[in-house]
């Protein structure tokens, strides 16, 4: 089952993975994503961790609670999906950079 696997490299691979994860997490924190809804009446910004940084609402929506709620939900969902998609892309890059896990070819 473990034929061709070099266990002596496992520590090295894990250390590399840890370093890559820390670097990619720092990279993610510095990213900002933005989404708009209602033709720009509502805009939302979030960072790579999915934390909402800013919400801007056009004054014309302040008296239309139902529309405001719908547009806020839409913009927030969009920006959080962007952050999540970026996390998945970063994870894919990290896993791709781990090499052959010590398998001898």
From Swiss-Prot:
List the disulfide bonds in this chain. Answer: none
Q: Does Ubl conjugation count among this protein's keywords?
A: no
Q: Which UniProt keywords apply?
A: Cytoplasm, DNA-binding
Provide any one GO MF term from the record: DNA binding
Q: Which Pfam families match?
A: YbaB_DNA_bd
Role this protein plays? Binds to DNA and alters its conformation. May be involved in regulation of gene expression, nucleoid organization and DNA protection.
**Keyword Transmembrane among UniProt keywords:** no
Q: Which HAMAP family does the UniProt record give?
A: DNA_YbaB_EbfC
Species the sequence originates in: Campylobacter curvus (strain 525.92)
The entry describes its oligomerization and partners as:
Homodimer.
Task: Identify the InterPro entries for this entry.
Answer: YbaB-like_sf, YbaB/EbfC
Subcellular localization is given as:
Cytoplasm, Nucleoid
- On the tree of life, the source organism's domain of life is Bacteria
The protein's name:
Nucleoid-associated protein Ccur92_18190
This protein's GO cellular component annotations are:
bacterial nucleoid; cytoplasm
Family recorded in the similarity comment: Belongs to the YbaB/EbfC family.
Q: Which Gene3D superfamilies match?
A: Nucleoid-associated protein YbaB-like domain (3.30.1310.10)
């Amino acid at each position: 089952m473990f034929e061709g696997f070099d266990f002596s490299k496992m520590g090295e691979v894990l250390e590399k993975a840890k370093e890559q994860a820390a670097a990619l997490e720092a990279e993610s924190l510095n990213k900002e994503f933005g989404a708009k809804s209602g033709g720009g009446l509502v805009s939302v910004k979030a960072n790579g961790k999915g934390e909402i940084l800013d919400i801007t609402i056009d004054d014309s929506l302040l008296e239309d609670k139902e529309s405001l709620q719908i547009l806020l939900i839409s913009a927030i969902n969009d920006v959080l999906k962007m952050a999540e998609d970026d996390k998945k892309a970063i994870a894919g890059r990290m896993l791709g950079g781990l090499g052959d896990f010590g398998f001898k070819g």
